[in-house]
Amino acid sequence: RLQGDWSSDVCSSDLLVYLGFSYVAFRLIHTIRDKQAGRLPSVDLSEYITYVIFFPAFTAGPIDKIERFIKDLRQPFAGLNTEIFFNAGQRLIIGLFKKFVIADTLALIALNDTNATQVNSTFWLWILVYAYAFQIYFDFSGYTDIALGIAKLIGINLPENFSSPYLKPNLTQFWNNWHMTLTQWFRAYFFNPITRGLRSWQKPMSMPMMILLTQVATMALIGFWHGVTWNFTIWGLWHGLGLFIHNRWNDFTKAKAAEWASTSFRQSILSVSGIIFTFHFVALGWIFFALSSPVTSWNVVLKLFGVN
């Protein structure tokens, strides 16, 4: 179980054990479901164990697919040439810098249970929230870079996990670029199956209601995965409802927006405004991720908008 402000304690032994076994569970479910569906490639026991407990990705992902992983594993290791060594080393150094310089520095001023109750200035509360938003990004993406760099040194090309998520113009694109392998896993093994199940019901369900149920349920489950607490539940529901609202809003305004954005300047206005709005929506959600109490979290939200 994770607690609030988890990213600042990400090196604790209990947390590493929790994360490691949760990622093992993802890999086990992936292989079991694909075996049942007849999609699992033929692998021997040593290959399977290597995939499940592959040490660079054990504690924080990314969540690789076994068919892609085995393909790399079976390639004869030709040693390290200059290009591979440089690329892997560069990725490793970038990850270390992100985690231990940028993220750990931001942690000094990032939102937490202590300063959330001590700071009453709206301006400084926004600074704390921004600091936490970037701390968690550089912390997590830094660990991913470290994992990718180490894996590349031993001949395994793990999948990317982050692609500038804070520069995306809507919440759907944010989740397609934040912890991408987790999003893909939940889409494949939870979202898509329950969507098919709802469509096969004898009693038809409206498309908006189906989208609401599937998106909220998926994000709530992702929240539970981080920890069975009210704050993680609220965080999951926040994103589930946000995804649903974006879906409905996009369907309603797509034609009008396309008509209005007839010039590159107007397209830039839409894109930049979308990026700013999406980032702030995500940043407000991080408040429930950073803090351990719903009451404290809501008080911070109110103070951010000048309501004391």
Per-region residue spans from a language model:
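Short, exposed "boundary/linker" segments that immediately precede the start
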Residues: 1-5
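Membrane-embedded transmembrane alpha-helical bundles that form the catalytic cores
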Residues: 8-308
